[in-house]
């Protein structure tokens, strides 16, 4: 009897002639003996080619017994459907398999190129992630970041002036004498002596004055090039600030008692009052304009605009300070902590005046803080919206008599701007008191209108304000 194992094999293979009479010796005891088997004229096993034609199953690859060959992504998963385990056998790495399986199982979510503006796409299971270039944001990198910039936030990223626009992104602009660079935010000088730059430092490749008035230090020659010295009858009167070749800003109270206006002289490029070094330029003051709201002997609206008889020549030692736009001054410059004040005023309260130009770095205070500090020493100064406080409450440093009318200059991103005018204070460097400055931003439009208008007759003029 043919063994059960052989019969089963024959049935599974469906072979014809598998059990031919002469093919297998049959043992009398019901069991086969290898030693008694003798080959007959018929075969039990067929050739590989015949078997390949007999075995019928769902085709998964290009050849028989493909599992014995190295895995191929093209053969296993592109021509036929493969399982996760089969893909893992091909990649030999779980993470690589997962990355492949995301796209293989639900399609490539990046196929439609959803990421805009140069963003790169990473496929996820039924989703995708866009990696945006630095200037863009959003799910599909569809939003230009600058669209979210507003001028009140870091000046909109602008180096100088910023303008907000409804429905569109903010735009940057530059002061006269500068032009906007291709990046849309930076400004570059277009003239030899633009306002707010210090040529002496530019040529030395430095950025800020070395000098740090009462408690101050000497401003190195050429590092305060907009400083003006006002003389009347040859005597020191006040300070001032050059804002272009023909206009100077000072304090109105400096002119309360002037009688001989023809002897009012403005000196530019001055440094040491005890010597003449050839960099000075003297110009007669042709006209003094004060606000109609200023009352002599008081402190409110303490500002004056002076027109020179002839323009000055801009040099390394004579450069105007930028008169900023009002919005820029109020929302940006007003929050710069420290600014410079300069002048030839008294070095001590009731002391001698300075021979060399002095400069002091002073912190700006909120009006409420200024009032609170003053009340602690029993004082209640009248600080209006046309003024601001700056200085130190410990009595160590301050502007003083003789500095009046001089500049409070604020530095922002490489350029200096006029933000205040030395006006008044309780003594000089008195404990618990601060210097009070005219808030120039309140008068920007007033100043610009006067400078654009035709000259009017007269030396002292009162112009309507506001």
UniProtKB/Swiss-Prot annotation:
Question: A Gene Ontology CC term for this entry?
Answer: Golgi lumen
Site for Important for S-112 for O-xylosylation, residues: 113
Q: In this protein, which residues make up the domain named Gla?
A: 61-105
Tell me the compartments it is located in: Secreted
Glycosylation (residues): 112, 120, 205, 382
- GO process annotations (BP): blood coagulation; positive regulation of leukocyte chemotaxis; proteolysis
Q: Where are the transmembrane segments?
A: none
Q: What does this protein do?
A: Initiates the extrinsic pathway of blood coagulation. Serine protease that circulates in the blood in a zymogen form. Factor VII is converted to factor VIIa by factor Xa, factor XIIa, factor IXa, or thrombin by minor proteolysis. In the presence of tissue factor and calcium ions, factor VIIa then converts factor X to factor Xa by limited proteolysis. Factor VIIa also converts factor IX to factor IXa in the presence of tissue factor and calcium.
Q: Which family does it belong to?
A: Belongs to the peptidase S1 family.
Write the protein's name: Coagulation factor VII
**Which organism is this entry from?**
Pan troglodytes
């Amino acid at each position: 009897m043919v063994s059960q194992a052989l019969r089963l094999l024959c049935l599974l293979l469906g072979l014809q002639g598998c059990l031919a009479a002469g093919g297998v010796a049959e043992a009398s005891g019901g069991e086969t003996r290898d030693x008694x088997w003798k080959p007959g004229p018929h075969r039990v096993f067929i050739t590989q080619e015949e078997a390949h034609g007999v075995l019928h199953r769902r085709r998964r690859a290009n050849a028989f017994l493909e599992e014995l060959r190295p895995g191929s992504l093209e053969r296993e998963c592109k021509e036929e459907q493969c399982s996760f385990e089969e893909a893992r056998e091909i990649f030999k790495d779980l993470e690589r398999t997962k990355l492949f399986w995301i796209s293989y199982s639900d399609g490539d979510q990046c196929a439609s190129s959803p990421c805009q503006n140069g963003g790169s796409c990473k496929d996820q299971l039924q989703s995708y992630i866009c990696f945006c270039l630095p200037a863009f944001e959003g799910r599909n990198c569809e939003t230009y970041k600058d669209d979210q910039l507003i001028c009140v936030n870091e000046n909109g990223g602008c180096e100088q002036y910023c303008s907000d626009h409804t429905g569109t992104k903010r735009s940057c602009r530059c002061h006269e004498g500068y032009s906007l660079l291709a990046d849309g935010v930076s400004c570059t000088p277009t003239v030899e002596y633009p306002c707010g730059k210090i040529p002496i430092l530019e040529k030395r490749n430095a950025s800020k004055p070395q000098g740090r008035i009462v408690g101050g230090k000497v401003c190195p020659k050429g590092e305060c090039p907009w400083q003006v010295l006002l003389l009347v009858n040859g005597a020191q009167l006040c300070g001032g600030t050059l804002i272009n070749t023909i206009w100077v800003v000072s304090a109105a109270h400096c002119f309360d008692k002037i009688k001989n206006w023809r002897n009012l002289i403005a000196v530019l490029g001055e440094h040491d009052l005890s010597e003449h070094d050839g960099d000075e330029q003297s110009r007669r003051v042709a006209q003094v304009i004060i606000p109609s709201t200023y009352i002599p002997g008081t402190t409110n609206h303490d500002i004056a605009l002076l027109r020179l008889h002839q323009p000055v020549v801009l040099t390394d030692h004579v450069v105007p300070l930028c008169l900023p736009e009002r919005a820029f001054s109020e929302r940006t410059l007003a929050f710069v902590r420290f600014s410079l004040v300069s002048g030839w005023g008294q070095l001590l309260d009731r002391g001698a005046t300075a021979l060399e130009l002095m400069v002091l770095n002073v912190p700006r205070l909120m009006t409420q803080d200024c009032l609170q500090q003053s009340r602690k020493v029993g004082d209640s100064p009248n600080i209006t919206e046309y003024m601001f406080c700056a200085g130190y409450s410990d009595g160590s440093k301050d502007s003083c008599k003789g500095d009046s009318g001089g500049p409070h200059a604020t530095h922002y991103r490489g350029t200096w701007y006029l933000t205040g005018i030395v006006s008044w204070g309780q003594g000089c460097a008195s404990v618990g008191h601060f210097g009070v400055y005219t808030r120039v931003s309140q008068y920007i439009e007033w100043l610009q209108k006067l400078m654009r208008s035709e000259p009017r007759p007269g030396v002292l003029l009162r112009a309507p304000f506001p």
